[in-house]
Amino acid sequence: MGRYTLALLPLIVFGGIAHGAKMLYDQDFHGKNIAEIPSALSHQGADAEPAAARRATLPALTDAAIKGKLTLVNVFASWCLPCRDEHPVLKELAKDGRLNIVAINYKDQSDNALRFLGELGNPYQAIGIDPNGKAAIDWGVYGIPESYLVGADGTILYKRVGPSTNISLKEGLVPAMEKALGKPVS
């Protein structure tokens, strides 16, 4: 019996580590969803200009593209698999005329980003190119995809770390939009 237990020990240890990693991925030890960590810029003004340094052949992301309207800023890259997963959700969200959706293309080649958008569709009204990640640092990004809901005054109202899903929209982004708009979002 001791021989079999010893043989199963690595499997049991691996299972425990995998389960713990899954729990950490889903939530921290305080029961909070870590995908909704506040941005370092929360409730401060957001500056889009650094991402406009190099532009693709799409409308450029500037401060004017963000301020004055409720805007979702999505940080993505063509090489990011979770970005591909969330793309259909963003395309559907782009149909809501009350929300402006713009992007920061993170550490990517412009040609690759254009191919990505050509293949999957373009939900963005403007795109900033961030080849070295400086704009992402300015925004407080630490992994992509990330999305920021920015109020009409330029204040970050909500941050989503990881791919947006229908569930995350319902539980996080939509309530933040409703609060910003002062009315229910259908």
From Swiss-Prot:
Q: Entry's InterPro entries? A: Periplasmic_diS_OxRdtase_DsbE, Redoxin, Thioredoxin-like_sf, Thioredoxin_CS, Thioredoxin_domain, Thioredoxin_ResA/DsbE_sf
Which GO cellular component terms are attached? outer membrane-bounded periplasmic space
Keywords per UniProt:
Cytochrome c-type biogenesis, Disulfide bond, Periplasm, Redox-active center, Signal
Can you cite a GO biological process for this protein? cytochrome complex assembly
Which residues does UniProt assign to the signal peptide?
1-20
What cystine pairs are annotated?
A: C80-C83
Query: Which is an annotated Pfam family here?
Result: Redoxin
* Thioredoxin domain segment(s): 47-182
Q: Where in the cell is it found?
A: Periplasm
Q: Which GO terms describe its molecular function?
A: disulfide oxidoreductase activity
What functional role does this protein have? Required for disulfide bond formation in some periplasmic proteins. Also acts as a disulfide oxidoreductase in cytochromes c biogenesis. The cysteines of apocytochromes c must be in the reduced state for covalent linkage between the two moieties to occur.
Q: Of which family is this protein a member?
A: Belongs to the thioredoxin family. DsbE subfamily.
Q: What is this protein called?
A: Thiol:disulfide interchange protein CycY
Name the species this protein comes from.
Rhizobium leguminosarum bv. viciae
